[in-house]
Amino acid sequence: MELEKIDEFLSSWSKGVIEIGKIYREGGDYIKSAKHFLSTHYAFEETDVLFKPTFTKEVVFRNNKKDALSYFVGRDISEDNGFALKPWGSIQLAELNTLIEEDLTAAMGTLKFKPYEIEETTLVAFTFIFRKIDETLKIKVHHSSPVT
């Protein structure tokens, strides 16, 4: 059951990132979409979150919702171009390892990010540690980095 929830979460997370970029391309309210994405997938509103995004150098960690939003849509931190605005055409799970215990759920694996209308892919390693909130998984710790 918990493994199904992890699979569903990862699918929803990937679709959410793609959707933000799609709304941006179409001239829609991508900020609203990104805020909804963060509220749905990250536990910023319920607890402390540790977030180390894939492509950060100057401000390495984004441990609050405002800074996480900047990473995904490029607003408040100068190095942010908007990770979700690339836009991505597909995000595919390449490898998944899980740890499911009584009070801990974690996923570690790789995702293949393919930009919209471009054939190159970027392989990213990720670790998500989840907290169950109202029977829903949300990210409490997120670390990701490119696989080079």
Spans of features found by a protein language model:
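Secondary-structure edge/capping motif, primarily at the C-terminal ends of alpha-helices
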Residues: 17-25
